[in-house]
Design a protein with these regions (language model features):
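Peripheral, non-AAA+ core regions of ATP-driven protein-machinery
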Residues: 2-18, 23-167
């Protein structure tokens, strides 16, 4: 269950929902929240997640922010990234891609689409990796209220494993 964990309406800028495998190897819903403040380009991380994936996202964000928008000045702001485990699953196995999208949303002051769930991950070099357990992850996302899924192209080959009733 978990209906309503991904609420209707546009989220505030810097807030994204992601589906990742938790410590118990179950697809779990997480919310990433970014707070952007005037500063010098520092990152503070809180919540039940490994700092390494967030550091990769932040380093990529700082290196490539101008490719997203010329108005992003990563060195003129500090960012606080907080992860909320919405289903009690513990630390997620992936969080880099969703963290990057949350950082961009927060820095631009623009929300992501309503009821969006982000899947997949990203390497330091920007390579997007596929979603693990695609069918289960989609089911969890839809049960939680997601109406839109951001899915890596690298997961397209797994679409035939998804039951038709999920589409």
């Amino acid at each position: 269950t978990g209906g309503g964990l991904i609420p209707e309406g546009r989220p505030n800028p810097g807030i994204v929902h992601t589906i990742a495998m938790s410590g118990n190897e179950m697809p779990t819903i997480y919310r990433i929240e970014i707070q952007t403040l005037a500063g010098t380009g520092k990152l503070l991380v809180s919540g039940p997640l490994s700092r390494e994936p967030v550091r990769i996202a932040f380093d990529y964000f700082k290196a490539h922010a101008s490719r997203v928008s010329g108005s992003i000045r990563a060195g003129e702001h500090d960012f606080h990234l907080h992860l909320v485990d919405l289903q009690g699953g513990g630390e997620p196995d992936v969080s880099t891609l969703a963290s990057l999208i949350a950082l961009c949303s927060g820095a631009l002051g623009r929300p992501v689409q309503s009821q969006l769930a982000i899947m997949g991950d990203m390497s330091l070099g920007g390579v997007i990796t596929p979603t693990r357990n695609l069918a289960e992850s989609l089911q969890v996302a839809f049960d939680a209220g997601a109406k839109r899924i951001l899915l890596p192209m690298s997961s397209v080959g797994d679409i035939p494993t998804v039951p038709g009733e999920l589409f």
